[in-house]
């Protein structure tokens, strides 16, 4: 992505985009590492700061030793333990008519319009995280995707979004059924896991924590590599997870340094949940800077050949760009006006 950002926007604007993207990547990586440490603490009872260091060392070792295919399988399959929340949501027997009513946009909590819009921006930002674009586009280049790979990966993306959306709805259902009537605000990472424990006991709690652990651990790996891909592509370094460290030393050093700096950030005692919220908002702000060069490339027949955007794709692409531009402009003002959604 970032070789195209530099080419399409110029060095200065491209560098500004790179810096903004790296800051967001670092914030996200730090938040995910904090999440890994919290899960490990809930599972082991060991000191939080010790587990932060162990989490970073463990993630670096995993990235250094395992091929990416095994990292995908390990974190992907164990992350599916999160499906315990879907089963828990069904077992709690919610009022499904109320669940269906929840799909109609609107606020029933008495919150102001600004608070409602802030959460709209946050949800859209969480679904459009730029690091996913950096990570998977770089992986596509590294794996030498051809046209025959596009169909399979479209299906994979649809399944992934459907699975993520289903998990999100399930978490909202269990929160509404278990926590809202008791006046509990699930502000801590471990709180949602209690819903699985309520339904399935210790086994449910274990599945929930393992699922969260590997989901956030996988995201930490993705953000660190996304940051390294960005730097390497912008400055023209040799890059690739499949390269030996000695063959791509600056790329390797980049993702290790991102882990190390994220470690320092989390060691300051910052709340990982709050850091996640801020990283989502700032990723929304940076998103148009990345999206525009991609839209320009999609219209370049020299790059895209027969896959160049048609008229309908351009209309949708421009409409989407206008949407994310509006979201980007309003994100920080809404965060300040609503005190981070607190009203």
Where are these regions (language model features)?
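Membrane-water interface regions at transmembrane-helix termini and the short interhelical loops
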Residues: 32-43, 55-78, 266-272, 303
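Flexible loop linkers connecting adjacent transmembrane helices
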Residues: 1-13, 38, 69, 182-199, ...
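Hydrophobic transmembrane alpha-helices that form the core helical bundles
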Residues: 14-45, 51-56, 216-235, 271-275, ...
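Extracellular/periplasmic helix-exit of transmembrane alpha-helices
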Residues: 141, 162-191
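Loop-to-transmembrane helix boundary motifs in multi-pass membrane proteins
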Residues: 11-12, 49-53, 159, 163, ...
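Membrane-interface loop-to-helix entry segments
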Residues: 54-55, 63-93, 280-282, 287, ...
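Hydrophobic alpha-helical segments and their helix-loop junctions in multi-pass secondary transporters
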Residues: 80-107, 117-137, 294-302, 327-339
């Amino acid at each position: 992505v970032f070789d195209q950002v530099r080419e399409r926007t110029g060095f200065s604007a491209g560098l500004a985009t790179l810096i903004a993207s790296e800051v967001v990547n670092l914030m996200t990586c730090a938040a995910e590492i904090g999440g890994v440490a919290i899960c490990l603490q809930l599972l082991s009872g060991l000191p939080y700061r010790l587990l932060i260091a162990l989490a970073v060392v463990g993630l670096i070792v995993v990235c250094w030793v395992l091929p990416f295919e095994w990292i995908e399988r390990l974190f992907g399959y164990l992350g599916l333990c999160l499906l315990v929340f879907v089963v828990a949501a069904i077992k709690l027997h919610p009022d499904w008519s109320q669940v269906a009513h929840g799909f109609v946009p609107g606020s029933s909590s008495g919150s102001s319009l600004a608070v409602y819009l802030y959460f709209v921006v946050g949800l859209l930002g969480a679904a459009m995280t730029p690091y996913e674009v950096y990570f998977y586009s770089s992986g596509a280049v590294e794996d030498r995707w051809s046209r025959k790979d596009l169909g399979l990966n479209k299906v994979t993306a649809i399944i992934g979004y459907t699975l993520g959306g289903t998990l999100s709805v399930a978490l909202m259902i269990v929160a509404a059924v278990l926590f809202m009537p008791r006046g509990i605000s699930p502000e801590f990472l471990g709180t949602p896991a209690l819903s699985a424990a309520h339904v399935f006991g210790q086994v449910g709690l274990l599945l929930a924590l393992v699922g969260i652990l590997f989901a956030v651990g996988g995201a930490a790996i993705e953000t660190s590599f996304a940051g390294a891909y960005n730097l390497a592509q912008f400055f023209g370094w040799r890059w690739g997870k499949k390269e030996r460290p000695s063959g791509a030393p600056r790329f390797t050093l980049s993702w290790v340094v991102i882990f190390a700096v994220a470690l320092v950030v989390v060691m300051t005692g910052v709340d990982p949940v709050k850091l996640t919220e801020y990283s989502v908002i700032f990723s929304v702000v940076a998103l148009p800077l990345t999206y525009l060069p991609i839209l320009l490339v999609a219209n370049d027949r020299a790059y895209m050949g027969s896959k160049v955007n048609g008229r309908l794709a351009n209309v949708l692409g421009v409409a989407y760009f206008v949407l994310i531009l509006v979201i980007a402009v309003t994100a920080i003002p809404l965060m300040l006006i609503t005190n981070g959604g607190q009203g």
